[in-house]
Amino acid sequence: MDKFPMTPEGYHALDEELKRRQQEERPRIIQAIAEARSHGDLSENAEYHAAKEAQSLNEGRIAELEDKLSRAEIIDVSKLSGNTVMFGATVTLVDEDTEEEKIYQIVGESEADVKAGRVSITSPTARALIGKKIGDSVEVNTPGGGKSYEILNVAFQ
């Protein structure tokens, strides 16, 4: 059974989503199913079928969240240190071609948000960076082609 590394913030966000789905969405959907059922013939009842589909999607997501949370390996990034890139590190890179700086934090899969500078530990960027140190050059294979970066800084915050 694989563990999912995640930050305490990532765990909290998934836990909040699980609670919302269990305590708000589930009762709302059950009520919608009951109301649609009261309209009679279920074979041609679009409201009923839509509510049942919503129930299926919600219950599937609940099961997925419960699984991820049960297998979460919470890593408190503030207790990490060093100059080697690992899970939780905030890495400052410079594109060796354009001199453009980028800052990424390496987080768990469910926490990733590239626009917010949070890349999944399983992403090509993170896989290329893991184990590298300040001053190292890395080649990252992106969908747009290969990129060369130099690591300027590694921080844990």
Curated annotation (Swiss-Prot):
Residues covered by region (Disordered): 1-24
Coiled-coil segments: 53-73
Pfam families (alphabetical): GreA_GreB, GreA_GreB_N
Top-level taxon of origin: Bacteria
InterPro entries tied to this protein: GreA/GreB_C_sf, TF_GreA/GreB_CS, Tscrpt_elong_fac_GreA, Tscrpt_elong_fac_GreA/B, Tscrpt_elong_fac_GreA/B_C, Tscrpt_elong_fac_GreA/B_fam, Tscrpt_elong_fac_GreA/B_N, Tscrpt_elong_fac_GreA/B_N_sf
Keywords: Coiled coil, DNA-binding, Transcription, Transcription regulation
Gene3D superfamilies per the UniProt record, alphabetical: Transcription elongation factor, GreA/GreB, C-terminal domain (3.10.50.30), Transcription elongation factor, GreA/GreB, N-terminal domain (1.10.287.180)
Single GO biological process annotation from the record: DNA-templated transcription elongation
Single GO term (MF): DNA binding
Family membership: Belongs to the GreA/GreB family.
Cited function: Necessary for efficient RNA polymerase transcription elongation past template-encoded arresting sites. The arresting sites in DNA have the property of trapping a certain fraction of elongating RNA polymerases that pass through, resulting in locked ternary complexes. Cleavage of the nascent transcript by cleavage factors such as GreA or GreB allows the resumption of elongation from the new 3'terminus. GreA releases sequences of 2 to 3 nucleotides.
Annotated protein name in UniProt: Transcription elongation factor GreA
Lineage, broadest ranks: Bacteria, Pseudomonadati, Pseudomonadota, Alphaproteobacteria, Hyphomicrobiales
